[in-house]
Amino acid sequence: MWLSEHWKDYELIDCGRGEKLERWGDQILVRPDPQAIWNTPRTHKGWKANNGRYARSNTGGGQWQNKSMPERWTINYGNLTFNIKPMNFKHTGIFPEQAANWDFAREQIKKAGRPVSVLNLFAYTGAATVACASAGATVCHVDAAKGMVAWAKENAKSSGLENAPIRWIVDDCAKFVEREIRRGKQYDAIIMDPPSYGRGPTGEVWKLEENLYPFVELVSGVLSDNPLFVIMNTYTTGLAPSAVTYIMETVISKKFGGHTESQELGLPVTETGLALPCGVTTRWTAK
């Protein structure tokens, strides 16, 4: 398991009974988490005294209750600053477990000793984009949601990177990659966080288990002749890490050699000293 254990402004205080107790800066939040299936004692005062709890409804969706948190605030991760805005579907705008990948990407970029171009697909609010730009990379940030790209720009500005070489694209990721291939555009590194399920711009259904292999084949077409790394996040519980490794090996490694490794991402739990699993990341590296 790759742990994101260098946070100061975020803390996973406790988890269990389908929920997690978190500290985001000075705000204490309770949010659902399907992985927290254990029934451990709730001894921390934050379970009862918090700034907001997201409660799921019986009909799907949910809402924030007992809200005393601001509409937005910022937290830092090293020299990066992120805007936190609790949304109607439990999310805050940052997945803190991804910090392990931000650290990995920055290390790869810094030690490359050459200019590095990164393509960030399904890029959400741009934490990975900002991390890579802070390490000196040129980044192309792609997400189909205009609001998420605007949020990502805010994160770049808050991190002092508003003038960094970042190309902001609102587009369907597959369609964009197809056009980049036709244009002959190439990238040294790719980061992608494909959804488990979704619909494309013309209503076509995306299912990760069915579409992942052809999508990896597609994006391999924009890798440069001297690629550095590929990071792919998969949050689908039914997809085994070894299956994702198999796909990366048969597509990326077949073309470029290198090494592929899949691991769970995890967050350390303060109250127990254990770790909460938070999805799977697969990393391909050239060496």
List the predicted regions and their residue ranges:
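Conserved alpha-helix/loop element of class I SAM-dependent methyltransferases that forms part
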Residues: P96-R114
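Short beta->alpha hinge that forms the Motif I/post-I loop of the SAM-binding pocket
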Residues: A123, D143-G147, N211
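S-adenosylmethionine
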Residues: C173-K254
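Conserved SAM-binding loop of SAM-dependent methyltransferases across substrates and taxa
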Residues: T125-V139
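Conserved class I S-adenosyl-L-methionine
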Residues: G113-Y124
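S-adenosyl-L-methionine
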Residues: A145-I191
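Non-catalytic substrate-recognition/targeting regions of SAM-dependent transferases
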Residues: H6-E22, L29-P96, D103
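C-terminal catalytic and target-recognition region of SAM-dependent MTase-like enzymes
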Residues: P227-K287
